């Protein structure tokens, strides 16, 4: 039950009952009517701009229309008070009985409270991480991994049919560099002194096990082969080794994908899929042969001063047309992007989300143009860009580069502070904003550490049930009807907690609609703050404590409230991919 959806329906029924509105309904735009929390909580629990939206087309004074709507709202037995503010905002304060009824709904729903059918089963593909398989995951990959995974969880909770996908970039020139680097480690494993790693190769020690595995499998046979013979063998083995390492790194972060899509598959059979995708664009009139003028500034690697096969992307929203086939007949990197998007579209996805690093900002328009051209506008494409994460160690930023071998791995960060702090803190800023990761801050046991503060609220909730078991040893907490006891909840501070719980479905819906999972983390912190505040009031005033061994009925009712808080905390933490501990010491 979404409080705001519920009152939107009630207000719509009232509007339909007003003759002048009913008579002019076809001329009115009800979509602009909002039902939301008031900006100032002291004004009430629900606010609507209905009178301000409808007054002008009806030729009425907004305040007069607000008074008319407000008078009808005030007749609702679950409305305690209605007031009109400013030019015509209608503020509604709900009755205690409404909050009690809503608490019963939340308690019965448990961790499913806030789950919705917003997606209506629509198929959505979320592609994230997609790091080159050239080494272990570093902390720079971490944010996109967490944002993508949490977004996928959020969309699934909101009724979408979600596929989590990883695109393996295993067909580019970097793979040849990787293979040569692994071959060098193979020679080292055979006892050869390789000296310093040559410039341009990957120097990291993470390739030592790959070289040893090649030596175990092939002995000395690779060393006597020409490069064109050993290269495909080494490529295959080292890509498998790197992807196994990446999967382990992601598992340490509780990130799991449904599909791992290999770029090499697009190049199989003479690049048949790429050729088919370009033919499809050609049939739709989006491909031509021509020359592009040299762009201002630095020349992109796919620009040539000769005729190429081009995607007419400027006609579908891009800044410039994009090369697909070079003058020598080879495909550009973007041609593989075309084939990959077409593959997703052919798999029946209604929407594709790409979670990319901020350095991929230049790809946004070309991908959006590609989506319009291939789908004819029927498929939606969204690109989320994740800004950089800065790590500080001894006051100095840590350089991260696979090529130099000097980088902090994702696994090192997780091993040092734990999975939960990493996941939650990666969501505690909007993904489009830079994030500083403070090793000391994320392990503090204080309200200044959001993940501790939220998890501690859940642990406190569970401790209340242990206290109740001690206070009422004959009480079977597994069988009592906590929802049925909600009618005993009446204290204003308890109503404040129920009101905060009531916001959750709206927060989930807004976060899913805007593709912003950080909203869940922000909400959880706010809910934890209200709960901790109520807990502290109970320390000062015994009458407000959740468990009162002198009042069994009230204690059971308050257990229902605590159960509701714990359920929403656990639900939100699950979306973020963070655990909800029963105890914290």
Curated annotation (Swiss-Prot):
GO terms for biological process: arginyl-tRNA aminoacylation. Transmembrane segments: none annotated. Its EC number is 6.1.1.19. PROSITE patterns: AA_TRNA_LIGASE_I. One of its GO terms (molecular function) is arginine-tRNA ligase activity. Pfam families: Arg_tRNA_synt_N (PF03485), DALR_1 (PF05746), tRNA-synt_1d (PF00750). A motif ('HIGH' region) lies at residues 131-141. It is an enzyme of class 6 (ligase). This is Arginine--tRNA ligase. The gene is argS.
């Amino acid at each position: 039950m979404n409080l705001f959806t519920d009152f939107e329906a009630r207000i719509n029924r009232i509007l339909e009952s007003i003759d002048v509105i009913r008579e002019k309904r076809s001329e009115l735009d009800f979509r602009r009517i909002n039902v939301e929390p008031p900006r100032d909580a002291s004004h009430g629990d629900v606010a609507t701009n209905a009178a301000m939206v409808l007054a002008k087309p009806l030729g009425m004074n907004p305040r007069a229309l607000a008074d008319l709507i407000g008078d009808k709202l005030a007749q609702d037995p679950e409305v305690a008070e209605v007031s009109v503010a400013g030019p015509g905002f209608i503020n509604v304060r709900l009755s205690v009985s409404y909050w009690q009824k809503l608490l019963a709904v939340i308690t019965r729903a448990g961790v499913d409270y806030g789950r919705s059918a917003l997606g209506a089963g629509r198929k959505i593909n979320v592609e994230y991480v997609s790091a080159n398989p050239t080494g272990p995951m570093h902390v720079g990959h971490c944010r996109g991994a967490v944002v993508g995974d949490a977004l996928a969880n959020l969309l699934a909770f909101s009724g979408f049919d979600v596929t989590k996908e990883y695109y393996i970039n295993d067909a580019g020139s970097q793979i040849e560099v990787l293979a040569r680097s692994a071959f060098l480690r193979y020679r080292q494993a055979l006892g050869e002194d390789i000296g310093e790693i040559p410039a341009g190769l990957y120097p990291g020690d993470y390739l030592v096990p790959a070289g040893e595995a090649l030596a175990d499998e092939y002995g000395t046979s690779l060393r006597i082969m020409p490069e064109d013979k050993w290269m495909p063998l080494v490529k295959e083995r080292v890509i498998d080794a790197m992807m196994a390492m990446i999967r382990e790194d992601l598992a340490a972060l509780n990130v799991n994908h449904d599909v791992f899509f290999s770029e090499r598959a697009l190049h199989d059979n003479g690049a048949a899929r790429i050729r088919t995708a370009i033919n499809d664009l050609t049939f739709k009139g989006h491909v031509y042969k021509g020359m592009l003028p040299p762009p201002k500034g630095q020349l992109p690697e796919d620009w040539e001063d000769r005729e190429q096969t081009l995607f007419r992307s400027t006609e579908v929203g891009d800044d410039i047309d994009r090369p697909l086939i070079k003058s020598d007949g080879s495909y550009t990197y973007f041609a593989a992007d075309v084939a990959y998007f077409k593959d997703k579209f052919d798999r029946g996805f209604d929407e594709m989300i790409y979670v990319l690093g901020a350095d991929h900002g230049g790809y946004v328009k070309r991908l959006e143009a590609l989506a319009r051209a291939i789908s004819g506008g029927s498929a939606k494409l969204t690109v989320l860009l994740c800004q950089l994460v800065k790590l500080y160690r001894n006051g100095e930023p840590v350089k991260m580069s696979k090529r130099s071998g000097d980088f902090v791995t994702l696994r090192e960060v997780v091993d040092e502070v734990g999975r939960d702090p990493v996941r939650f803190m990666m969501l505690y800023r909007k993904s489009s904003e830079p994030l500083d990761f403070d090793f000391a801050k994320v392990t503090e046991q204080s309200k200044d550490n959001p993940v501790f503060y939220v998890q501690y609220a859940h642990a406190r909730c569970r401790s209340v049930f242990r206290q109740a078991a001690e206070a009422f040893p004959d009480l079977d907490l597994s069988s009592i009807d906590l929802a049925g006891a909600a009618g005993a909840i009446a204290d204003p501070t308890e109503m404040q907690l129920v009101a905060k719980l009531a916001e959750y479905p709206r927060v989930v819906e807004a976060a899913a609609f805007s593709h912003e999972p950080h909203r869940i983390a922000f909400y959880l912190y706010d809910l934890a703050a209200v709960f901790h505040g109520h807990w502290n009031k109970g320390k000062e005033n015994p009458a407000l404590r959740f468990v009162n061994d002198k009042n069994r009925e009230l204690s059971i009712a308050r257990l229902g409230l605590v159960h509701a808080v714990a359920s929403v905390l656990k639900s939100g933490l699950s979306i973020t991919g963070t655990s909800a501990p029963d105890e914290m010491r």
